[in-house]
Amino acid sequence: RFDYNSISTFSSVLSANIQDYFDSMGLQTSYNACSYYGHTPLTASLFSIKYEYSTGEPSLPNNVSLLNSASYNLESGGNSTVYAYEYNNTLPLGFLINSSSIAKMNSEAGDPFTMQNNFVTSAVNGGQMIFHRLKTDGTNSITAQYNLEENDTANKSGTKVYDIYFYCETLTATISNGSIQDKSFVSSSVTTSTSKTFDSANQNYICHLGNVPEGATISISASDNTAISAMYAYAFDETAWEYDYNLLNANPYQVTSFSDTKIEGTLTTDKGNLLYTSIPYDKGWSVYVDGQKANTTAICKGALTGVMVTAGTHQITFKYTPRGFFQGIIISIISLLILLGLIFRDRILELITGKKKGSKVPSKKPQVQKAVANEEPKVSK
């Protein structure tokens, strides 16, 4: 409809593996759809999201830049403005990660923040945790103060503002002793609010609250006043993310051309490893490294496509052919021949037998030739 590529998908044949992976990373899904709701700077980057448009503030104000804006007329009268934002850190379609991280990506982590931390710390050597746990009562209250896990060695003393994300069923979040402070791209000033509501949260996705001052208390409540059974709250670490992004982007797969069924590009690496791609895994994909067919690997809970590559500079081509495509062509041709045979059955039988069914062969009639007298009769004188 809008003629652009998007991460959001509605399909009756949506892969169950895609749904499972989206769920584990905190993105919104249903039985026949997956959505951009629940994205973080990491998941937006992993799926190569470059742009976002909105009629107001962007979803991740700390991680985008205003690219352009345009006014338009509303059907109901008046006018509005649409803003185009560009993400600051977008990973390419493919990049190298440690092959040993496959096990981590396929494991269950308990909550999406731990899952995302596991990705960055295992995908690259020296990767840092990008989410740090906050104090909560486990159900409906968050305090803007760190409660670091045992394996989180980050020194976060002196933090004055927390970029807070949380995950639970829900939701309206209300701030006490502080306010949500988002970077405003429209008026270049700080905007504040004390509450934020999230739609369709019964499908469980990560909610981004925004920048909250240290010590503030956030109360979480469900719109239908139902009890919240569990809640996870973390602060995003922009410094760690910048560091991890540079590590992940060190060996990018650079696309040189693409179409609906073919992607071509190059990759340079000084050691063999796993090429991670955000291409949904499907047996219809074939990959060729320097012209030689290579094996694809299902990664990220079987949702995405990976390829093992050796050290060096490689030309890597992905080709897609729907499963059963050639068998379908053969069956279609055979079916067409059978149909034509039924339609022209009588004529085919005529050609085979050399005569029409039930007709008689006409007999040859002798030709009677009439003599014509060309000579005039003789007259006696």
Each PLM stretch: what is its role?
Residues 127-368, 372, 378-381:
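Active-site-proximal, structured, solvent-exposed surfaces of multi-pass membrane proteins
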Residues 6, 53-56, 89:
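Short, flexible loop/turn elements at secondary-structure junctions
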Residues 45, 58-63, 79-135, 224-243:
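Catalytic cores of secreted or luminal carbohydrate-active enzymes
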Residues 30-74:
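Periplasmic/luminal catalytic loop of GT-C fold multi-pass membrane glycosyltransferases
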